[in-house]
Regions:
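Short linear motifs in low-complexity or flexible loops
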Residues: 4, 9-14
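Alpha-helix boundary/capping motif
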Residues: 18-19, 28
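Short, Lys/Arg-enriched N-terminal segments with co-localized hydrophobic residues
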Residues: 27, 33, 41-57
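Chalcogenol-based redox active-site neighborhoods
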Residues: 52-220
Length: 220
């Protein structure tokens, strides 16, 4: 047993694949270093100074003032937009690759059954009429039937409603899945604009879910 204060690294012996053996276990250099640092910290020494290579950056928003973590990092401007497969109101797939060569605006939100989300779809429906060669896609976890009902009732004709109810990985690829909070499992409010070459040129993660996005920024 290695007691705190004893530098156990000197007892390690090189094993297969250039790993070090300590008792019945093998450690690579990074693991051995980590164990030594843990021993130093236990003895009241310095804090670990190596970054955690497996650390995942999580984006954070708020819901009525309370922090909400997203499962992953929100997509950044300048990167290639990941392809996705959503479901249209007729239950056929909608893929980003199907829209290649056109400008795409993704209006992402939690649910059509909230006033703010419904307002965003109405606003983008008006904007879409004046945006040349642009496809505006309304994305949420609502069922395709709910999307169809809303668009029929509200007279939405310039927006393509699309559902992520099949958990196809869209939320993970774009970093918009709420990992906790009252709306856990739904999509955070965001707007992503993709140019004709498939690059993200605008990415807006709305800080407060109960507030509307910046429409002007998305329309530029």
């Amino acid at each position: 047993m290695c007691l705190p204060g004893i530098g156990f690294a000197r007892f390690a012996r090189a094993g297969p694949d250039n790993k070090f053996r300590f008792g019945p276990f093998y450690y690579n250099k990074d693991s051995l270093y980590g164990l030594r640092r843990q021993s130093d910290v236990f003895r009241g020494g310095v804090e670990p100074d190596r970054p955690n290579k497996t650390h995942i950056v999580m984006s954070t928003v708020k819901f009525k003032g309370s922090p909400v973590n997203l499962a992953g990092e929100f997509i950044r401007e300048g990167v290639a937009a990941p392809d996705f497969e959503l479901v249209k109101t007729d239950l056929t797939p909608l893929r980003l690759s199907d829209l290649k060569g056109r400008r795409v605006v993704l209006n992402i939100f939690p649910s059509l059954d909230t006033g703010v989300c419904a307002a965003s779809v109405r606003r983008f429906n008006k904007l879409a009429a004046s945006l040349p060669d642009t496809v505006v896609v309304a994305v949420s976890k609502d069922l395709p039937f709910a999307h169809a009902r809303f668009c029929t009732t509200e007279g939405i004709e310039n927006v393509v409603p699309a559902s992520d109810f099949r958990a196809s990985g869209f939320d993970a690829a774009y970093g918009v899945a709420m990992a906790d909070g009252p709306l856990k499992g739904l999509l955070a409010r965001a707007v992503v604009v993709i140019d004709r070459e498939g690059k993200v040129v605008y990415a807006q993660l709305v800080p407060e879910i109960t507030e509307e996005p910046d429409y002007d920024g998305a329309a530029e």
